[in-house]
Each structure stands twice: as C-alpha cells, then as structure tokens.
A protein has these predicted regions:
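Conserved C-terminal active-site "lid" loop/helix of NAD(P)H-dependent oxidoreductases
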Residues: 127-133, 150-189
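NAD(P)-cofactor binding segment of oxidoreductase domains
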Residues: 1-9
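Catalytic helix-loop patch of NAD(P)-dependent Rossmann-fold dehydrogenases
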Residues: 7, 16-59, 64
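Mid/C-terminal beta-alpha module of Rossmann-like enzyme folds, strongest
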Residues: 112-158
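Structural signature of the Rossmann-like NAD(P)-dependent dehydrogenase/reductase core
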Residues: 9-12, 57-58, 95, 119
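Catalytic phosphate/metal-binding cores of nucleic-acid and nucleotide-processing enzymes, i.e., regions
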Residues: 7, 22, 47, 100-101, ...
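Helix C-cap/helix->beta junction micro-motif
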Residues: 3-4, 52, 139
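NAD(P)-dependent short-chain dehydrogenase/reductase
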Residues: 47-94, 100-101, 107
C-alpha cells in the first residue's frame, strides 16, 4: 500500500474554554475547561487527533455567521425587522467571524500547511448586544428597541464563555494572514 501525506483539518470552537472569566484573549496553548457537552466533545476530539500523531491542523473559531443557514446574524436581521423590542446579552464578549473569511484562511493554510492549533476570528471585540445593534444599523431596522440584558436574564441550555476573544498571534505569525475588522465583514455579508 502506498503511503500518503494527508493532513487532518478540524474546525473547532471557543467553547473549549468554558465559562472561565478570562479578560485577555485565549491562546491556542491555553488549557481548555469546557462546561457543556459541545465544548467537551470538541476538546476531546482535539486531544484525540493530537494523540494519534497524525499530521493535523486544528482551527478554533468563534461566533461564526454567514448569509446561509441558521445563525445569530440572520436571526437578528429577522427579529429586529419583526419585533418592536428585543433584549440582547451585553455581558458576553467575543469577535464575530464571517464564514467566508474563515474559508479564505482555510485555503491559505492548506496551501502552506503547518502542524498546530490556530485561532481565527475577525478583528475587534464586541458583545452580542453590540453585534445586534450593528446588524440592525446596517440593514436599516431602526424601529426595534434593542435593549441590553445580563446573560442570567436570558437562560440558555448552552454555557458560553463570558469572554471568548481568541488570541490570533500564532496564525498571523505562521501564515501572514490578514484579518478583516468584524464590522467590515458584517457589512460585506449583509450586502450579498
């Protein structure tokens, strides 16, 4: 049988960091402390991939959205257009990631692969409230009264990290990738 140099690429998540109260960006080497099933299974699969000794690339991302499928951006476009008022969490911060930007980075990485765990999201930081405000502004849904609320007021079956900003230094230094600012990418997504 012929040996082949295959690369295993896994797209992972900020959920591997759990609900720890970080106030600095999470680095690729930082220990994961997931609390939910999704985060635990993602971290477990990362560990298994690394333990196999295969040639791997793990890309963690966060707050992923696009013009397709079900996601926060599309939901907020709909809700701000149809609801007179809306409460959105302001005490969880991160960086939205446009799926098209992630796709471009994956292609860049495939062209010059390097083994490792890397983080990718767009640039900047915002809360879910800030993200919603910007979505409504871009699409012109100005009639909805968007109010901020604590995450404790909005029960969720999923435990999200309170501060899920990803440290992207390693991917920048390894692949020389440019990271669009989250608002620029959001405008691009919505204009499509």
């Amino acid at each position: 049988m012929k040996e082949v140099d295959w690369w295993l690429i896994q797209i992972s998540t900020d959920y591997v960091f759990g609900k720890e109260p970080y106030n600095i960006p999470c680095g690729p080497a930082q220990k994961g402390t997931p609390t939910g099933v999704y985060g635990k299974t993602k971290l477990h699969s990362e560990q298994k991939i690394i333990a196999t000794g295969c040639i791997y690339i793990i890309i963690r991302t966060a707050w992923l959205y696009s013009e397709f499928g079900k996601n926060f951006c599309k939901t907020m476009i709909n809700l701000t257009a149809t609801k007179p008022a809306l409460k959105v969490v302001f005490d969880q911060c991160g960086t939205p990631t446009y799926a098209l930007d992630l796709a471009h980075v994956i292609i860049t990485i495939i062209e010059k692969p390097q083994v490792g765990v890397f983080h990718f999201s767009n640039e900047g930081v915002c809360s879910w409230y800030d993200f919603t405000q910007m979505i409504a502004k871009i699409v012109g849904n100005n009639d909805c009264d968007i109010q901020s609320c604590y995450s404790s007021e909005y029960p969720s079956p999923v435990t999200r990290p309170a501060y899920s900003v990803l440290d992207k230094c390693t991917i920048k230094e390894t692949f020389y990738v440019k990271f669009p600012y989250w608002i620029d990418s959001l405008e691009k997504c919505i204009s499509i």
